[in-house]
Each structure stands twice: as C-alpha cells, then as structure tokens.
Amino acid sequence: MKLTDLDAYEVLEQCPLRDLKSEGLVLRHKKSGARIAVISNDDDNKVFYIGFRTPAEDSTGVPHIIEHTVLCGSDKYPVKDPFVELVKGSLNTFLNAITYPEKTIYPVASCNDTDFQNLMSVYMDAVFHPNIYKHQEIFKPEGRHYELESEDAPITINGVVYNEMKGAFSSADDVLQREILNSLFPDNTYSNESGGDPERIPDLTYEDYLDFHRRYYHPCNSYIYLYGNMDVAEKLRWMDEEYLSHYEEIELDSTVKAQKPFEKPVEITKKYPISSAEPEEDNTYLSYNLVVGDILDRKLYLAFDVLDYALLGAPGAPLKQALIDAGIGKDIVGGYDSSTMQPVFSIIAKNANSADKEKFLATIQDVLNRQVKDGVDKKALLAGISASEFRYREADFGQFPKGLLYGIQCLDSWLYDDMQPFMHVEALDTYRFLREQVETGYFETLIEKYLLHNPHASVVVIEPERGLNAKREETLAEKLAAYKDSLSKEEIKQLIADTKHLKQYQEEPSPKEDLAKIPMLKREDMKREAAPLYNTMKKCGDTTVVHHEMFSNGIDYLRILFDIRDMEIKDLPYVGILKYILGYMDTERYGFSELANEINIHTGGISASCGVYPHVKKPEDMQFMFELRVKTLASELPQAMDLLREIIMTTKISDEKRLREIIAQLRSRVEAAFDGSGHSVASMRALSYFSRAAYYQEATAGISFYELVADLDEHFNEKKDALIAQLEKMVQTIFVPERMIVSVVCEEADYQAVEAQIAFLLKNLYPSKKIVKERSLPELHLEKKNEGFMDASQVQYVARAGNYVRHGFSYHGALRILKVIMGYDYLWINVRVKGGAYGCMNSYMRNGDTYFVSYRDPNLKKTDEIYDGIPQYLAHFKADEREMTKYIIGTISDMDTPMNPSAKGARSMTAYLQGLDFADIQKERDQVIGATDEDIRGLKDLIASVLEEKNLCVIGNEDNLKSQSDMFMQLKNLYE
C-alpha cells in the first residue's frame, strides 16, 4: 500500500494482517483528530463506515433518532430521504445505519468503484451537514410527534422510532436483555436505552436532540473504516479535502466509563406483557449474569466464546442439562456477549417460575463447582474451539459483506483503545493458544475467577403480567388527555395546524433539481449478463448429483435432499419436528452431547431443513424436500459423512426424556422467533390460504406447526407413543435411496472423493421401498381464513396476499422493479413515513404468489386500505429516464448481491429444482434493464387481481384486533 502526499494524516501503525491476507493501517487526521482504520486487500466488495461514540445519557432514544434522521437530507444532498434514493438507485451490497448502546455507525458497501465513492459522499455529508437543523419536520415523523386532527379528537403520539421501540418493548427477550444491562451497569451508559424507551421518547425535545448531534458528531469523535480493493490514498485525500480539514480538533470526552465492580450481586424483578389468553405459570424468565473481564483482553475474548459452547451452548452442555433435569425452565439460553466494554456472561432459564429462583442459582453454583473440581469436558472444549475457528476461517456472513463484519469487530477494541482496531480480527494465534490450554486447567481457572467467585453479578427475573400493555396505553391516554387539557385554544389550533402541515410536508416530493444532486450510475454501468448457474449433472449409481464446480477454499458443501412430495398432508407438521430432532438425540455410538462435539470437531455444521420449490413453468407442481446440509474441510469428509449416516440411521427417537426436552425447547424457540418476525409469520399464513407451496412452509414452520408443538408440549405423556411411532415410520419412509438427490459445491479435484462418500451413504440408507417413480402431490383443500392473531404486542403486522398466475397473468422482470418502487416509494411513504410503521415489505414470486406486509405498524385498517390503493397508484405512475434508471439500478443491486461458494451453489440448485435455466434468468435481467414506466403501469391489473382476492392475516395487539374484528373471518390468540 503506497501512501504518498498524505501530510494531513499521522500514520500510527502499518502492519500485515496475515489471517485476513490483508494489510492494516491505522491513522489519525492531524487537524480534526478523526481516527481511521484500513484493511486493504483484493476483495472487490469494498466497505466504508463512519461511526461515532454516542453514549446515551437517558432513555429518550436520541442516538437512535439521530441515526434515522441524519440520512434525511444534507447540505450537499438536500432531498428528503437520500438513504431511500440510494437504496433505489445504487449498486450497494450493503446500506444501513446501526445504533448500539454506546456507538452509532453508518456503513455502506459496493463492488462498483464509482458507486462506492457516491455512497461515501452521501454518508459523509449526512453525518456532518444534516438538514436536521433546518427542518424540524425531519425530527417529528422519525422520532415522535403529537397528532391532533380536530378540536374534538384525542391527541395521539406517532413516530417511526417510537413505534419500532413499542414493538421491541413488547418482547420478553428484549425486555430481559435491557434489564440485564441495567442491573450490571447502573452507573454508566449501558443503564440507558439508546434505542429509546417508548415511555421516555416523548420527553425528548428538539433542542436536546440537536445538542446531542452538535456534541458527538464531530470528526474528533469519529471512527472511519475502509476495507477492500481501492486506492486508499485517494480516498484519504478526498476525506481530508471535502470534510475533515474543515474541522479543528476539540476537547470532547465521550469515553465509556467502566462500571465499578460490585461488592455483592444485585437482584432485580421486572414485568413484561402477555396477552389475556397466555398463562402466567411457566412464563417467567430467570437469569444469572456476570461481568467478565475487559473487552481488551484478547485471549479472554475468545476463551469465553469457547466456554459459552462447552458450558451452555452445546446440546447437553452441563449448565443447560442440569437446569433442564432440575425442571427449571423449558429452554436454557444465554452465553457470552462481547458487545459491551465489559463483556457479560448470562445463564437464562426461559418459561420458568419465580419460585424456582433459589434452585436455579444453587444448580448453577453446583455445576460450576463440579466443572472446576472434575475439569471441563476436553472434547467439548476442542469442539468449541473448532467451531469458532471454522466460522472465523470460512467468514461466511450470508448476505453481509465480510469486510463489514470485520469492521464492526474492529470497534470491539478500537472504541476503547485508539491504537488497537485489529486486536480481535487477527485470531489464529489465539486459537492455537487455546488449543494448547485444553489440558492445563486454564479454562477451569477462568470459571473459578469469573463465574464462581465474582461479585459483579446480577439475578434478573422478569415475570409475565396480563393487561400490562392495556395499563400502559391507559396511562398514556390519561397523560395525553391531561396534556390536551393544559393547552389553550390557540395552542390546540396550532397543534391541528402543525399536524396538517407535517402531512403536507410528507406528501410533497423533493424538487427535481435536488433529486438530480444525488449521484447515480447509468444503465450502461450495469452488467448485461446474468450471473451463471453452476449446474453439472452427474450420477452416482442411479442417484442424481448436481455438481456446482468452483473454488471453495478446501471446503466441501453438500446438501443431501430427499424427495417427499408424496408426504400426506396430515404428516407435514411432523416433518417440521423431525428436522429439529436429527442431530440432537442419542445415536448408536454417541450420546447427544458427544454427537454435538464430534460434529463440531469434524465439520462446520450438520443441519436439517425442509425445502419447498414451486415449479415456475408448471404452477400446479412443486418439489418438497427434506434436506440435510453438511459443510466440512475436504480432508474431514469421510468423518462428516459417517456422522451423517449415524444421525440418519441410528437416532434413538424412542428416548422419551430427550424427546420431551426437545419439544419444550422447540416451543420456546418458535415463540421467540415469532416475536421477532411477525411479518414473516403473517405473510406466510396469508399465502397458505391459497398456495400449496406456502401451505407446506406454514405447516412445517408457521402457526400450524407451532400449534402442533404447543399441543405436544402440553399433552406429551398422552401423545408421546404416537409421536415416536410417527417419527420412526417417517425416518424409514424418507431415508431411502430412491428419494435421494445430492447438491455438491467443491472443486473438480475433490469431486471423486465426494462421490465415493455419496456412494457410502447410499449403501447405508434404509432398504428400498416400493415407491412409484413419479411421486405425486396429495390432494389438498385450501380455503380463505382471514385470521387475526392476538398477542401482547403494542403494534401490528398486517399482511395481504394473492396469486396473479391464477388470473391469467405471468411473471415479468418488471415485478422486480415494482418491489423497489413499492418498498421505497408508495409503501414507504404511506405505511412508514405517514403511518409510522417501522417497515413495509412486498414480494412477487415466479409462481404468482404475492404479498404485502407491514412491520411494527401502529395501524391496521389504514394499512389495509393503503394496499387497496396500489392499483390506482400504478395507473398514474410516471417516471422520467433518470428516475426509471434509478429504480432499475436498485433492482440490479438486489439481484447482484455478491455470493460466496455456498450461496452460489444454493442459487444454482434452487434454479434446478424450480425448473429455471440460464435463459430464464437472462430473460428476467433483460426485462429489468430494458424496462420503462409503461411496463410498471402495465402491472396495474396484475396487482388488482391479487388484491381482489382479499386474503388478509394480521398479528398484533389484542385490543386493536378486537376493536376491528369485522375485518376478520376468525379472531384467535397467537399463544394460549
């Protein structure tokens, strides 16, 4: 890395980052005091962020509201929402902003050099020169504002952050995590809610909000990060000339103060809301939490990641199993959290009872004492190290650029030591150290010091309370009524005028001359050719093998699929249960805890799932697969496949005790998943009213699946024999050679060895049954239900769905563009900006299945009516060449997300299973790049046909759904 003519910067360190095959650079901008860290390498997926240390001084949510609002226009880019303009019109591979308890970061990523520079420019201008000082209208809709429609109407509060946090404060898991931080750090920033407490957000004044930005959004408080293949010197010069050189360093103390250690543990009991139908028994959360050292202790940082696995995280881990065996809670979670300056280790029993608190604590102490006395299981320690190291080496973060994850990890040390941004991103020497310590008593010493004899601890109990949300709403209504009574007639008229003015402001589009200031690529900057499919058809005996040949860095990725499209409808939820038990029960050679260790020592993971693949050219047909996934180093493949054989063929499903534990744990985890993804649950349910594909997904992972799991949990003793018989029969029916097909990602040189292992597995499956070669789908009766599912949330998830193919329409690439237009224009403006919902999504599948859904939405009927307005919006849709190009670029950005080998293989295999070839994918891309606004208008009737079906499903606040019960055919409790 050549650094010339950079007198504006002081080079603090330049060093090789060998583990990342990169070069590291640490700088300080001399004039402004800005900190800069660079990881330079040949990765074209470039990453930039600027972050600030933003310690919250109260729980009004000011750091969070600023994060939302600085991206609502700036000096150089004065449009109302540059963030949305970039989403619609850039080739970004990541674009967002994130608020943490003590920091806020603004990251972007792109593989296109020009686009990357454009993104950097908009973000730098946003954080340093935001329009929040010019327009109070920016603060109100994103943060909070009072609304008054008429003199006789009640005053209400609305705001995107306000509603987002109302949703967060309805979740037991979120409430618990918040109280854990409050309990352990009463004297520093972690005791405050940086996201905002809905009861405190209304207290934030516009002046305090601006003051927070003035204080903390200065270069001397900034952390600037660059990653990837770029001209680093050119980027540094640009930052200096355009922004940093305009500032003088100032005295600013934003350091996070360490919490003084406790002399003895503290105890806290709090409440969280449940619906009127949910039981208070078995719904308490018990937690024991400890502050574990210092984030700048590099060895401790990873050592506790390993102890997390060995003590708590692994199936059958001693803390988890002892608490389950003692009858305390249905699921034991927690572990090591390194997101704070002083990391935290938590042990949490979910679905427990307050009366078990002393037993909970005594069991923990007993287990920890035994671990120190008898020693931690060495295999468990090795498995924990191997699993952590495999994740580190593979660096597979899904759709997130790995450079972004490295950058966030830099802040784990950099935020507290200006000279140490790379402390935790270089880790291989620490893994070697930890392996050497397995037999030395090192880990036992850590347990003794930090978990057994550590007074800086807390016991946090959160108990359920029916009607808590109703109480909160009643208190808020009284507070707002009192506020209204305190206003003079003139003030009431002014509030009505302010409400009207804000709505007018929200409806006014940004001037075209301002929109033109947002930098944008041209259509010719986009690649015309679609990404290839990597499907080479091969055979292993009579079994089809789809080989996705590519460089995979010595890792083999296998998907073993079993065609179960002929599965009886009544058995579908049991398929969902089967995927959760395989790998988590005893087998012929291993106890389930030993099995987990073997999997983590020899592989990067073995997992089971169900896959639904509707055929894109035969709407009535689809593939339904039971899938087993394995990833492993090529050298470990024989051991990995032997473990897979062991799981498939010898799992002891008849172990009633273990099966009981899994069912209880599964119920708890499905409920937690529902709380975090109500939009997905609602949209899947709405689709299941008419779509076979969605019905199968819903039956194996949605509300129908949950209802079976809950019933089994409550009546296990009566139903266990039938459950075991059903699962054992299913295993013998599914795992036969005739059903099997294999997807393999590996290099050509490794394929022969892979094929030998496939042959090994085929020989060890259950004997062939008489199976009709062309397995047919069973008869299925689908019906509209239009359900409302009531829960303890303070917000709603409103879903509408339908299928356009049933009405004679066919898929077109313009639907990809419509997703961008809906998500960031029509739905964004009406559901989020005006309505106050945190999010809104839409999807148009090739088989015709379509949905619209809102996320953490204060509204219900209003949102449903907004959906009905889409055809009218499309009928009048107009976009000039620049605007249309913007939508197309945003669409291509979504289509061209960089993929690792595993993701490329998955994309290719999905295409194969759905009957898609490269010509189909290229046709879609051509339609996208060549689209006009006329093509978008042409979708009006297609969308109208979907909405005319009137398929509705809503998950949300009990009182809100009851008050609008006429919208539903059925009103139910989500949990009982």
Spell out what each predicted region is.
Residues 62, 66-70, 578:
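Active-site His/Glu-centered metal-binding helix of metallohydrolases
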Residues 150-219, 225-243, 247-275, 282:
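Hydrophobic, small-residue-rich alpha-helical packing segments that form membrane-like cores
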Residues 211, 223, 232-251, 374, ...:
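Extended, regular secondary-structure scaffolds
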Residues 40-42, 49-51, 162, 166, ...:
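His/Glu-based metal-binding/catalytic segments typifying zinc-dependent metallopeptidases
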Residues 158, 210-242, 723-758, 948:
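Non-catalytic, conformational "gating/processing" segments within enzyme and secreted inhibitor domains
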Residues 1-47:
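Non-catalytic terminal extensions that flank enzyme cores
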Residues 45-55, 81-129, 136-148, 174-199, ...:
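M16 family metallopeptidases and their MPP-like homologs
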Residues 94, 210-214, 273-276, 333-337, ...:
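Generic recognition of flexible, low-complexity loop/linker segments
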